[in-house]
């Protein structure tokens, strides 16, 4: 049945569902960064515009026979499962939204210093941890599913390697983020969890070709980027509630740019061009407007 004419003919709907999950994932990235200071209708509108316009256009550039898909053949732009096409674009839109909306009321004092941490602490660390584990489990579907086939032994072997590299990259992100925060004075569990996401995002651009050790290193750098990216946003007085921008935008850029290190068919210049073009397009469509009444 897998290779039958009926299966091939009707696979459009499977791909539609698969891409719909990618689009929904990107929209949730935006929600995390702008939480607590945007009206529900405003967010529904921006999510609709993103899912209906931004993601289909950006996705088609690489996966739908568009401009960047020709670069794949001629110059070598690769994004296997969406480090840039899904995560960086969502993170770029989230960054624009967080800047336009400004910080939550009381997040920073008049001197620009952080307010008391108590009102802004994570509500439940166990629930945050559970959520990250659910994401980690779902990532096997995202990365493994992007192989788009399981009908041959080669496909099955490829998917199994993708699973292993996805697991190792997430673990690398956790451990690296934990080590960095520990060296700074205290192990930060939330940063470790975000580091896991950063590691997973980083490996998503090319989860098939890296060796297991390379996957760990790619994920580890992604986790470190999350820690220092969070500090950078803090220094810039940008209030990203859940750390979506470092975990998705910054780590996604890293994961896309490092692809040529493990994929000889990729080209750094084209990877950089793709990252810049796609993220600029995503930011240009993020026209959020809010004021203090958005808290009401």
Q: Model-found features: residue ranges?
A:
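C-terminal membrane-solvent junction of multi-pass transporters and transport-like membrane proteins
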Residues: 188-193, 237-257
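Cytoplasmic-side transmembrane-helix entry/capping segments in multi-pass membrane proteins
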Residues: 42-47, 188-196
